[in-house]
């Protein structure tokens, strides 16, 4: 019963709004001050239009006095005083005066007027928990038994004649404090009674967030969304992110008014889009792509491949690449040598120049800023796995000044955005963060921090973000400095999770001590490891569509890519410590090998753990499918790469493997890299003489499948072998 009582007011109010919101109340006028049309002002207008409020903006085009909005409220009083001159005698006209940059409407005119009249005063000011700007005035405030005690000048409502009296005595400067002016009037008992002023102590009309963040929560009900004040169990009509609470207003503004609900999802995501349909390649917006390689990064070759796969003509793209790492110098130069001419232009800042991270990012943004033909700046860090080729188009079509696609780390909640900031400006988890990351809430979100990948309009870089040093701010890291500077300019940063764009790489355990370091990334970055090293037709094999049986109980299917084969061979040759191919072998228990080969064991290159992960993830599922009823944990004592050469060890004598089953992966190509070779199963008199590169043979080991390695007659043959479940 208690729950029903709590929910009833919201349902009743929403029902009342839906009946009368089609036309705004004729005796209500909303006045606000906006010297320029910021994104905050456009949000305010959109929420007002949603409820059909009549809005009149005062002061557009005027300069705002004061610094950082700490002063300058006097301009608002002057403009209001002038605007009221033509309304001073309209006794029935109700005027709502409110800030706009950091305000959203949560309900419509009918509810607003009803609550105003219920206040039984001619003028109602918003109320705050904190006194400002003169704390010495606290003792003069009337004592309040229930509710907020102090006046807030960010919003008030009253009859036009009373508001005219309120501002009649204003003769201050534009840079003076409006808050102090209204406070002194309110604290004068005679004027307070004469004008008939009261405060909205219980936040029935106005919700100032400063000092009240813990009181306000989102309330979803009946396909609607409101802000509920838990302290007073009220549903405010206007939400004001005053003082340091603008980011919380951005969070609430993602939902209010009815912009996102559980029933409808995002109701405004398709508003104001910039369609690219039907536009020829030559007419598409010009984009500068900034690529940043700031630390050793795995799968850089995949990064460049994905960049090339973007569904956007290269001739409309310019490249700016900052490579801080000598380790990646050859890869970057190879990419540019092969594909640089495909782009409109290329600028490379390499490790030899020693440009710091923040300075390089400033360079990239400024290249677009200085070029009037640059419509967008697309910044992408090398640890971004951009798997959606349409990402750039999708971001452009969303038509935001600054927007980032959601990227997360595999299997983790780590992402490229923050939903909230702590008091000291660092990460804090918003209520909706997990739902956004995991896709339970889908939309376009106003957030305080983005990183790794984002799109900025060139027009924004030449206007609101024209400051050339975007990536320095106090002692913050470049990513945080960038976001702090954007927030300081009242530019919104948006994040979209409307599509699956890709993911972030984990760089925490990346090694650079090997020839091909990506081979060791199967734990940290399994998706990228699979893309680079597992054969594209492996999933078909797992579905039973590409599995052959050339000999009884010998299965043959694709497992490795060409790259996997080549890099494993090159890694072994780089290590170079091949065994001698005799029976004495100190690498194995007992020191004696019955059937010796010239090989290198996986544990010699510290690859044993990674190889076991490969067996568990990709071989074990095939084993269980091909040998029904057998389950394996893919344990092994021996896993190695064998080298066959005519003048070294051309073949292998008949033998049984010390395994329950064996895999034998061909690492190079017969007829190209070598001639001869293959495997013969003696009991079945069955031979496989043309192994396919990247395909593995899987067969039982001991007891049934007695086999030999056929002679390699020319070149060098490599195979990777594992004796599984010995």
UniProtKB/Swiss-Prot annotation:
This protein's GO CC annotations: collagen-containing extracellular matrix; endoplasmic reticulum; extracellular space; Golgi apparatus; rough endoplasmic reticulum membrane
Q: Per its record, what are the GO molecular function terms?
A: iron ion binding; L-ascorbic acid binding; procollagen-lysine 5-dioxygenase activity
GO BP, one example? collagen fibril organization
Q: How far does the signal peptide extend, from start to end residue?
A: 1-18
Domain Fe2OG dioxygenase intervals: 635-726
Q: How does it sit in the membrane?
A: Peripheral membrane protein
Tagged with keyword Iron: yes
Q: What does this protein do?
A: Part of a complex composed of PLOD1, P3H3 and P3H4 that catalyzes hydroxylation of lysine residues in collagen alpha chains and is required for normal assembly and cross-linkling of collagen fibrils. Forms hydroxylysine residues in -Xaa-Lys-Gly- sequences in collagens. These hydroxylysines serve as sites of attachment for carbohydrate units and are essential for the stability of the intermolecular collagen cross-links.
What is the name attached to this protein's record? Procollagen-lysine,2-oxoglutarate 5-dioxygenase 1
Q: Which organism is it from?
A: Bos taurus
